[in-house]
Amino acid sequence: MILNNNLKLAENAVLSVEESLSKVFQERSNQVFQKLENILTIFKEEKVSTSHFNQSSGSGHDDISREKIDSVFARLFLAEKAAVRMQFVSGTHAISSVLFGILRPGDVMLTLTGQPYDTLEEVIGIRGRGKGSLKDFEIEYKQINICENFDSFEEKIVHSFQENSCRLVFIQKSCGYSWRKSLTNHEIEKICSLIHSLDPNCICLSLIHI
């Protein structure tokens, strides 16, 4: 008898909580439906068909499937371009490919959000022997931390650009292993707008986890 009463109480508690959260669940479902509708619209407008799912040679030449998935991802994440490759084995691998693809000997890379992820330290050359790193290819690395006091970020960036002409600015959205707050998309937009006003040719590379 006691067991049955406890089960009934538990059942009522679950139903009560479920009812109180029904509005939240509905909002989440609506968000999912909206995003799904957006994805299906992109697939339709990009004219994705069964032919794009056929096996390719793997050489990458005239690979319509690869070009199509790049276009779909670029539109989905509101990017100018996208490179979607299963050959990227990690986030560090993907970021390294971007850095080595853009930077050339004599260029300056400026990090605005302090120390980068530890896996990038050896890629840059600020830790380890430096063989094959950006430093090894005579690419100069500098860093500041605008997150310590974001209200004064403009002053710090302007001062850095007065001292150096940067080819690439690296912005890490996530706090990583530090105690700082993660940057919002709006804050990153403000940073990029300021940088492009100082140097339209400077590339802003923002690391965002999706």
Model-derived segments and spans:
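Glycine-rich phosphate-binding segment of PLP-dependent enzymes
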Residues: 15-79
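Local beta-strand N-terminus motif with an aromatic residue
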Residues: 106, 165-166, 201
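Conserved beta-loop-alpha segment that forms the PLP phosphate-binding cup at the N-terminus of a helix
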Residues: 82-108, 117-127
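Gly/Ser/Thr-rich loops at beta-strand to alpha-helix junctions
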Residues: 62-66, 87-93, 115-118, 175-178
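Conserved small/polar residues in nucleotide/adenosyl-binding loops
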Residues: 208-210
